Structures are given as C-alpha cells and as structure tokens.
Amino acid sequence: MNIIEQKFYDSKAFFNTQQTKDISFRKEQLKKLSKAIKSYESDILEALYTDLGKNKVEAYATEIGITLKSIKNARKELKNWTKTKNVDTPLYLFPTKSYIKKEPYGTVLIIAPFNYPFQLVFEPLIGAIAAGNTAIIKPSELTPNVARVIKRLINETFDANYIEVIEGGIEETQTLIHLPFDYVFFTGSENVGKIVYQAASENLVPVTLEMGGKSPVIVDETANIKVASERICFGKFTNAGQTCVAPDYILVHESVKDDLITALSKTLREFYGQNIQQSPDYGRIVNLKHYHRLTSLLNSAQMNIVFGGHSDEDERYIEPTLLDHVTSDSAIMQEEIFGPILPILTYQSLDEAIAFIHQRPKPLSLYLFSEDENATQRVINELSFGGGAINDTLMHLANPKLPFGGVGASGMGRYHGKYSFDTFTHEKSYIFKSTRLELGVHLPPYKGKFKYIKAFFKN
C-alpha cells in the first residue's frame, strides 16, 4: 500500500468514528477554517500574485472574500440544512410516518484547477465539511505556491485523517481517482473530466464535474453599448481570461458591431492604461504551455486583430486582444480559449444567433446584453446553458442562493451555498410504522381483499 492509499484508508477510518456527523463538530471546523484563512491572508495573496500575477484586490474578491462569505453562510444555515424532513405518507401506508434524513457520503475527493486555485479548493470543501464528510484535496500543480500555502493551512488547522492535502501531478491524480471514494468533485477541463468520470465509474463513485466550454455573449441592437463593453471586459479579462465562465466569444448584431469594438477598445484603456503590460491590475498566463497554446491561436488570427495582440514570453504576458471578422470555422472557434483573446462574430437576426449557439455544445454560461424583453425571454427559454446573466457577466456566481454548474459537455452537478451541502449529502429515506395496528390488507391470504386493494389505489 502506497502513502496515498494509506491516507485514503486513514480518512475512511476517521469518518467511521462518527465524529463528523455531529453538527456542533461541523460548525466548529468551519469556524476554524475561517480563522485560518484570515491568518493566512497575506501568504495567500502573495502566492496568487506569484503564480498568476493577480492584483490583491482581484485576488481577495474572487478567492478569499467570497470563500469567507461562504463559510459564514454555511455556519448560519447549517442547522436548517441538516434537519430530518417529515414528508407526507399515503393513506394506504397507514399507520406509517415517512422521513428523509441528511447524511454525509463519507470520504470525498476534491480536485481543483489552477485558475482560481484557492477558491475552487475551499468552496467545495465548505460543502463537504458542512455535510459531515472527511476529505482529501488535490490542488493544482500548476500553481505550486498556492498549493503549498493550502497544504500548510490545512495541516495546521485539521487532523490529517480528517482533511488531507495531496500535492503532485498526473501520477498522484491517477492514483487518487482510482480509489473507491464515496464522492468525487472535479473542476477542470473537459478532457480531464472524462478521465476522472471513467475512473470513478470503475467503483460506481458519484461525481460532480465542473468544466467549461465556449460561453457566448449576445449583444443585440438595443443593448447599452457602454455598459456592455465595461461588463464584458471585466468578465473576459479578469484573471487574464483564465475563468471557466468568462465570455469566450461575442455574437453582436451587425448594426452595432463597430460601436461595440470602439467601446471595448476604450474600456480596455480605461481599465489597464496605455501600457497594459505595466498595469498592476492585469494578470499573467499560468505557465508556458498555456502561453504557447494561446500565442499559437493568436498567430493563426493575425489578420483579425483590431486591438492588442502583443505578448511577452518572459512574463507569460498576453495583451487583451479583440478579433474581428471571425467565422465559425476559424481556429479560435474550435476550442475553449481560456485566455485574454476575444473573437467577435456578427448576426443579422436573433433567430440566427440562437441557431448558432444551438449547433454547439451546451455552454457553462451565457450572457445577453439587451433592453428587449422579448429577446431576453427567447434566449432564456430557447437556449440551454449552465447559468448566466442578462446585462452582466460572471456575477451570477456571487449569489450563494443560486446553484452553479454545467449542463451537457460543460459539466454535471451543482454547488454553492446550500447546493454545496446538498452535493455532498445523501438523502436517506425511511419509514416508521407503528406496531399497535396492522390492517393486513396487503398480507396473504388474499381471498376477499381485491376490492380493498383497488379502493386503496383508486385514482
């Protein structure tokens, strides 16, 4: 048995002590986690800057602050979330009462990506702790400084058999995903998600897969162009475009395309200044592999660049870039971009825009900028997507009352707030039947009972 397998079985053994099922224990662990995150704030911010070039305002808002809010909400609501529910019982089961009890799955695996390497570890972990599970965490090896901070934070806060961090790369991940966990929560690319899903199926392990895809932005002829440009630029270029729900491409009505490009270009200068490479507010690409993938896409679209296009390998810097005259068969439209390159396509009618999106895999997010209520209702009702926003981008993630998750190729399962608790919770149903009375209609011998059975099931 290798060390990873040993840690797994130690975690299973800890769960079997029943400690984690106590509600006061769970609340105390969440309190300890909040305190630890606050004490590690400067280390977390420094690691995020080193690995991704994240400005501390952006890093705190998208990684630390939102996590602390989530912990606070879970501690506040936990008593209600964990209540056993008494549900209605049909008359033909008299004298019986029916219940749904919330219980933890057991030992869960959380695999996190590099783009929000702190938040995307702890958001699912909050749900796992709140639900009463033990957990093993696999942070991204592409953000090693953040991973080391997470390991120190967890090791100093929790019993290693309760919450454990496994650092490493592909080999360690392969070992983990083939173990018989009680639940696997994965955030990352579609290709890796398929590998995780296949491995989990060997042990019939339930999974949540949070992936991505090409999330579109529709800008129609009624849109407030200034507002649209600001909110699209925020959503696309935060974290240098390395956000799973970032706008991947724009579908703009042909009558307002030029106005939108002008507004986007102006907004980018307002956000990051004339020399964007010198801006303290603009991030960097996580590593050279992803940098070269993105510059290859840029090189294939040199004739389409209307803003940006510059890059610097030494800094892993890619300038925010706008591409015009893009078509559906362009190289940039064949994969999720996951970087600061924004293709712009046009449409003539809403029917055309809806058909374009219908022809592609269901996106993780979709955004519409419009003042037309009919257009809004058509997009919401006719298109399938994980989540989204009307006249905004990204911000649907900030509401813990909303579930977040994909559909189709963009993922399965949902989390955030109570939905995180539900994800890591098995709803166990049972009945309690009195021994004082037995009608006996369902028991042999059946002679003379047919009319009573029909009466019980009468519609």
Question: Which residue ranges define each predicted feature?
Answer:
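N-terminal Rossmann-like NAD(P)+-binding subdomain of aldehyde/semialdehyde dehydrogenases
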Residues: 1-99
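Rossmann-like NAD(P) dinucleotide-binding subdomain of oxidoreductase/dehydrogenase enzymes
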Residues: 91-227
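Short active-site oxyanion
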Residues: 32, 162, 182-184, 342, ...
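Structural signal for hydrophobic packing residues in well-ordered secondary-structure cores
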Residues: 15, 19, 34-37, 41, ...
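ALDH superfamily catalytic-core signature
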Residues: 191-327, 390, 448, 455-458
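Conserved C-terminal structural/oligomerization subdomain of aldehyde/semialdehyde dehydrogenase
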Residues: 21-25, 218, 317-459
